[in-house]
Amino acid sequence: MKSRLRILSILLSLLVVQGCVIIGYRNHFSRDLTPEQQSKVVWNTPDERLLSLKNDGRIFAINGKQMQKMVQPHPKAIVYQWSPHCTSEACLSLSAIQTLCDNNGITLFVVADYFHDAFSQNQILTYPLFIANEKHYKTDVCHKLEKRFYIDLLGEETYNATKEISWYRYAYFEKGKFVRYIRDPYVELDNR
C-alpha cells in the first residue's frame, strides 16, 4: 500500500512538473509574436519617460521605475496586474475596471502578465497597455519578472512588507505614493 501511494505521489508530481513545463511559467512569449504584433510592441529604454502617452494600440514594455514616474502626477491611480485569461472574481475585464476608475476619478494603468490576447483588448483603455520589460529585467520567468517590476515600482521595503497580499492585482496610489493593494475594486472604490 505504501509503495502504491509513493508511486501515485510521484506520478502526480510528474504531472504537475509536466504542466509547469507546458505552461512554461514564462511571461510574455515575445519570441512567439507575429511580425505584425512585434511591430506594435515598444521596447523603451529604462530612463525613458512615458508621461504623454495616449493609447494608440501599441503595447509598451516598461520597468517599474517608469511606471512609478507615470503614477506620480495623478491624484489617484491604480496599477492593475491584468491576466487576459484570469477567471477569478478578482480579475475584472478591462472595460469594467476602466469604467469603474473613470467613474471614481482614478487614473488606470494596466500591466499585462503576457501578450496573448492583449492586442485585441488594448483599445478599451485610456492609456496604452503596458507589460513588464523582459529585456530590461533579463528574464521572462513570470514570478521573477513580476517581483523585479514591483520592487522597482514600490521599493524593496514596501514590496517585502506587502508581498503576502500582492496577489490582489490592484495597487492603489495617491499623489504618487503607494497606499495599499485592493482586493475587490467594486467594494473598495465604487463611490456612486
Model-inferred region functions:
Residues 1-8:
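Bacterial N-terminal signal peptides that target proteins for export
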Residues 16-19:
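C-terminal motif of bacterial Sec signal peptides marking the signal peptidase cleavage site
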Residues 24-70:
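N-terminal "domain-start" segment that seeds a small globular fold
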Residues 68-96, 109:
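Short active-site neighborhood of thiol/selenol oxidoreductases, capturing the structured segment around
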Residues 88-90, 118-120, 180-181:
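Extracytoplasmic/secreted cell-surface and envelope-processing proteins
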Residues 109-149:
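Conserved segment of the thioredoxin-like fold in thiol-based oxidoreductases
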Residues 141-192:
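Thiol/disulfide oxidoreductase modules built on the thioredoxin-like
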